[in-house]
Amino acid sequence: MKPAGPFTRELWTTVQPVYEQIINCLFVRRLTDGTLPRKWFTYYLSQDVLYIIDDSRALAVTAARAEKQDEMYFLLELAKDGLDIERSMHDDFIENYTIPEAPEKSPAFKAYADFLLNNAYYSPYPVAAAALLPCFWVYYKTGEYVFKNAIDNNPYRKWIDTYSGNEYIQYTKRFIQITENLGQKTNHIIRKQMENAFTKGAKHELSVFEEASKQ
């Protein structure tokens, strides 16, 4: 998944070290080689079920603040249809793995959800969008890495396939392009805030994997 222009290229360059940490963290390495403990995966998935509700809410709030109608419609579509992709995968694993419902969000997932919602409500619209982008771009890149390196008959293949599917790719490409456009037309102060939000979002992606591997 390539950047859409100079601004998103700069964003990815900034976050590249965090991405390297993600694909080399214990959770992702063991997901890739098929040795991920079931306990870690069920913990992660039970938390992710709660997280995507707030992620969807943050997308909807950000959509309401969009300056262009096409961006508003896209973010609303993403809040529903894009996350339906994840819910379908969650439902399948929950049914087959008998995953218990988490009573509340864990510290790492709560911090991530709060970060997205705070930006959605209170940051300038371009910054809110940049904060949400890692949930798709970094997640896609991580899934792409796992897909290319996963062993045959990986027990978590459905999770892996979800984030390398064409529908998820198209949503992510469009989101990157929107962020590129927003970065190109705004001032340097907002661009810096967008960069900071994107980096923090990527770090939250890392933190939820690290938390799951400590269970």
Predicted regions and their residues:
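Alpha-helical bundle segments that constitute or directly flank the non-heme di-iron/ferroxidase center
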Residues: 16-21, 35-65, 85, 130-140
